[in-house]
Amino acid sequence: MSADEAAQAHENREAADGIRGTAHGTAPVPLSVLDLVTVGAGRTATDALRTSVELSRRTEARGFHRYWVAEHHSMPGVASSSPAVILAHLAAHTERIRLGSGGVMLPNHAPLVIAEQFGTLEALAPHRIDLGLGRAPGTDGATAAALRRSDTLNEGADDFPEQLAELIRFLDDDFPDGHPYRRIHAIPGPVQGSAPGGVQSAHRPPVWLLGSSGFSAQLAGMLGLPFAFAHHFSAQNTVPALDLYRQTFRPSPVLAEPYALIGVSALATDEEREARRQTRAMALNMLRLRMGRPGLFPDPAEAEQAELGAMEEEFIASWSANVVHGTPDEVRSGLNDLHKRTGADELMITTHAHRGEVRVRSYELIADAYELPTAG
């Protein structure tokens, strides 16, 4: 084996280690965090970002495997429009937990820009970065058009496989001779290791595909990539999508067997009634978003007093049923049942609440329910 081949094999092993986590305590699989940086009514984006810092540090101390930040735009109650910027900030406040995008919406960005951003993150936090990619816009159609500077709303989503291939080539710096991008390099990146005076190639963050249907599941399987499914807003498609991913999976240099995590909405409180109050606020927030009236995340008292029609109350009940909520024991039981039904390799918990301390407390209670160790 040549030196280059040995280096690549080492790189692949490190990538695989970053993908597969370790379960702690009594948890059946690794537990992770998905953060949308929720902004409550009467609070600011600064407040929400401070909560994200605290939450990343607390979940790191309790053995959560990774902490991902989503990309959403033009939503007053969500301050995660720029995952790379937020991740850089979190990297400065954490030491071990993996940090990643859940996800970056590839059609909204030039592949070279994403490669440069995540190469920079990898340089800031070596061997801790995940690059999760989605094909949805993460917003409404008009905002998507503004982001892409195009009147064609589907532009970018339709050629997602081609965009993905281009991004991976930038990450690996392996455009073939004769390609118009052959002399273009994502910096920081592998080319620095082969440049005069170069010491070693930069580590390439593992690429994940995100999805809520069969398209990304099949593509992830065919490419041998890890897959993250959005169970929290597409629960009816979870099992079919995971089955499709496993059926179409082809081993790759970074992943010998399929690895799938699912995102799940969960909220634990000391008392069951309070969990129901918080979950109703979560459902009301989603109802307003679906009705084209997104706003700051409502206070539970506002949600309790909201006058809704029969169809709106039906939506509230349906959405709440897909949130694993209750006392810590009830949430643990619900998460265990979800794992048994789906066979997911990892559970990524997302928790939304009006107050940041409610979110932080929920993760602490879940960690306690699973007897996760406390670092330090």
Regions found by a protein language model. Name each.
Residues 28-45, 107-175, 227:
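Flexible, glycine-rich active-site loops centered on histidine and acidic residues
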Residues 213-236, 241-242:
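A conserved active-site cap/scaffold subdomain adjacent to cofactor or substrate pockets
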Residues 35-50, 104-112, 201-211, 319-328:
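Active-site mouth loops of central-metabolism enzymes
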Residues 2-5, 12, 20-24, 153-189, ...:
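An alpha-helical appendage that flanks or caps ligand/catalytic pockets
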Residues 31, 59, 63, 71, ...:
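Conserved, mostly hydrophobic/aromatic
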Residues 1-99:
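N-terminal beta1-alpha1-beta2 module of alpha/beta enzyme domains
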Residues 31-35, 67-69, 99-101, 129-133, ...:
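Hydrophobic faces of well-ordered beta-strands that scaffold small-molecule active sites
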Residues 46-58, 212-218, 330-337:
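Short, acidic/polar
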